């Protein structure tokens, strides 16, 4: 839940697409939705779980993504319409059975929408996960060492978090692939971005 709804989803590291293995899909989505329904929405001074979005355009984007997903056959499990406590508030929203070509799967939502889809095989979910123009971070949750090795090798993302949701810090080479930026911030690699490389060739005779 925190991987999606921290900072109301307005975070480049926020999980956009949730792929859950089919045998546990229904139970997982139900448990996830129950926790999301318990999240509070309100002004920041009231210490809510979900605060306002940055502007009206951000709220309109949430509405567009929800409407598009529902039009394509997704199920709305909670949220989905702007909150009545203020113009820029949108409640935490869960969508299930989202098709791969829905806007919420094709664009970065930057808002409190969690979109779910089931998968049947490793090849299936890897193809879907990598089918994106951006590749900043992927979150992998599994108890299988073999699957960890397979997915961390084949996921086309600059960072992969395994069985955790926090992946920031000064020692980390923060950055992505594809349209998620060039170079790295943080770590030795990040420092090298601010240096000039000089090659000297010669001898002392």
Which residues are covered by each model-predicted region?
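ALDH superfamily catalytic-core signature
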Residues: 1-99, 162
